[in-house]
Swiss-Prot record:
NCBIfam families per UniProt: S15_bact
GO biological process: translation
Recorded superkingdom: Bacteria
Protein name, as recorded: Small ribosomal subunit protein uS15
GO cellular component, one term: cytosolic small ribosomal subunit
GO molecular function terms noted in the UniProt entry: rRNA binding; structural constituent of ribosome
Organism in which the protein naturally occurs: Desulfatibacillum aliphaticivorans
Gene for this chain: rpsO
Subunit text: Part of the 30S ribosomal subunit. Forms a bridge to the 50S subunit in the 70S ribosome, contacting the 23S rRNA.
Keywords: Ribonucleoprotein, Ribosomal protein, RNA-binding, rRNA-binding
Family: Belongs to the universal ribosomal protein uS15 family.
Length: 89
């Protein structure tokens, strides 16, 4: 399975902005990145799984929208997040 409850909780703990944070853009992007990474590995062995590929493209688009929102709202938080997740070179 891609995202166990334990893994999800660890990601939330790492990227939360306050104690009861589960929905901030940072947390959402971290969770999406984890799912995207899992699906990318899945496609290395299942090249013809086009239904899941469409889901991957939707996840990438959603992550892109969240990152754009964060960049427009607070550039420093955006830069910190992409550095922590290793999204840009």
């Amino acid at each position: 399975m891609a995202l166990t409850a334990k893994t999800k909780q660890e990601l939330i703990e790492e990227f939360k902005t306050h104690d009861s944070d589960t929905g901030s853009p940072e947390v959402q992007v971290a969770l999406l990145t984890n799912r995207i990474t899992y699906l990318t590995e899945h496609f290395k062995t299942h090249k013809k799984d086009h239904h899941s590929r469409r889901g991957l493209l939707k996840l990438v688009g959603q992550r892109r929208r969240l990152l754009n929102y964060l960049k427009n709202k607070d550039v420093q938080r955006y830069r910190t997040l992409i550095e922590a997740l290793g999204l840009r070179k």
